[in-house]
């Protein structure tokens, strides 16, 4: 603005000078003044040129400032664009992170499904193994049952136990009051029935084969014992001693029990083969 003010003041001074009347006797002076005026005019022109130069410089400076502003705007735009780019990159990063999270979730679900599938397969395998074990156990149980059945059919000890129990049941003499007679008859049963019968069954393993051989043994033995009891009472009524009467019964019972044992031994020998 200062060059413009100077220029305006200069024009005002020139106008004032030119508006003043020039005296005739002072023409040379006027001429000199003209020269001065022309010099002043030239000075004014130079000043104008200087002002123009200054104005050009100012214009150039304004243009430079404007350029700087434009450059600043461009920089600002670049910064804004950079901000947008950064924001876009952040959005892209978030999208990538979201995709990664989604991928991880999908992978986790797949792993969980695989684990469940493996567990189910393991459960199926365990079930099949249990089933095989159960079936194996069932087979073993059947085999054991068959073995037990076979052992029962071929168990001489079982045959012995059943025969002895039957002899104890059918050859009891505990009901006899006389101690002498009871002891005498018990000795006869032991020597004539129990021992020979046990020897007869030997190693027979299937008791059912010889079970019929003992069907009448109890009845036959009881008949002999009953007869000897009657004879013993008859002997005692004759004023004989108890010992003597028991000895008589002992000899008679022995001869009556032998046929019973012979019949059993013959039956066992034929059926036990």
From Swiss-Prot:
Disruption phenotype: RNAi-mediated knockdown results in significantly increased probing time and decreased feeding success when mosquitoes are fed on mice but not when using artificial feeding system with defibrinated human blood. Reduced collagen binding activity of salivary gland extracts and saliva. Reduced capacity of salivary gland extracts to inhibit collagen-induced platelet aggregation. No significant effects on ADP-induced platelet aggregation. No significant effects on the anticoagulant activity of salivary glands. Coiled coil: none annotated. GO terms for molecular function: IgE binding; toxin activity. InterPro entries: Aegyptin-like (IPR017262), ALL3/gSG7_salivary-like_helix (IPR056799). Disulfide bonds join 213-267, 235-245. Residues 1-19 form the signal peptide. Female saliva (at protein level). Adult female salivary gland (at protein level). It is found in: Secreted. One of its GO terms (cellular component) is extracellular space. Residues 137-273 are annotated as: Mediates binding of host collagen. Keywords: Allergen, Disulfide bond, Hemostasis impairing toxin, IgE-binding protein, Platelet aggregation inhibiting toxin, Secreted, Signal, Toxin. Residues 24-62, 87-145 have a biased composition (Acidic residues). Residues 63-86, 146-158 have a biased composition (Basic and acidic residues). Residues 20-160 are annotated as: Disordered. Protects mice from collagen- and epinephrine-induced thrombus formation in a murine model of lethal pulmonary thromboembolism. Monomer; exhibits non-globular elongated shape in solution. Belongs to the aegyptin family. Modulates blood feeding of female mosquitoes on vertebrate hosts. Inhibits collagen-induced platelet aggregation in the host via preventing collagen interaction with its three major ligands: glycoprotein VI, integrin alpha-2/beta-1 (ITGA2/ITGB1) and von Willebrand factor (VWF). Prevents collagen-mediated thrombus formation in the host. Binds to host collagens but not to laminin, vitronectin (VTN), fibronectin (FN1), von Willebrand factor (VWF) and fibrinogen. Influences cytokine production and populations of circulating leukocytes. This is Aegyptin. It comes from Aedes aegypti.
């Amino acid at each position: 603005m200062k060059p413009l003010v100077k220029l305006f003041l200069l024009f005002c001074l020139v106008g004032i000078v030119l508006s003043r009347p020039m005296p005739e006797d002072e023409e040379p002076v006027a001429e000199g003044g003209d020269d001065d005026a022309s010099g002043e005019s030239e000075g004014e022109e130079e000043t104008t040129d200087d002002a123009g130069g200054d104005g050009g410089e100012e214009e150039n400076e304004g243009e430079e400032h404007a350029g700087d502003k434009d450059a600043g705007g461009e920089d600002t735009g670049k910064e804004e664009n950079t901000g947008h780019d950064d924001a876009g990159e952040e959005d892209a990063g978030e999208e990538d992170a979201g995709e990664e999270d989604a991928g991880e979730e999908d992978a986790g679900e797949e792993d969980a499904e695989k684990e469940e599938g493996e567990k189910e397969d393991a459960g199926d395998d365990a079930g099949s193994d249990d089933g095989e074990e159960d079936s194996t156990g069932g087979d073993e149980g059947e085999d054991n049952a068959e073995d037990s059945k076979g052992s029962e059919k071929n168990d001489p000890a079982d045959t012995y136990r059943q025969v002895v129990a039957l002899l104890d049941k059918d050859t009891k003499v505990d009901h006899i009051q006389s101690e002498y007679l009871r002891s005498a008859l018990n000795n006869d049963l032991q020597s004539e029935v129990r021992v020979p019968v046990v020897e007869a069954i030997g190693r027979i393993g299937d008791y059912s084969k010889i079970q019929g051989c003992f069907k009448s043994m109890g009845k036959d033995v009881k008949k002999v014992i009953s007869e000897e009891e009657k004879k013993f009472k008859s002997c005692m009524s004759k004023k004989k001693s108890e010992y003597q009467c028991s000895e008589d019964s002992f000899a008679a019972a022995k001869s009556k029990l032998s046929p019973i044992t012979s019949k059993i031994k013959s039956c066992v020998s034929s059926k036990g083969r």
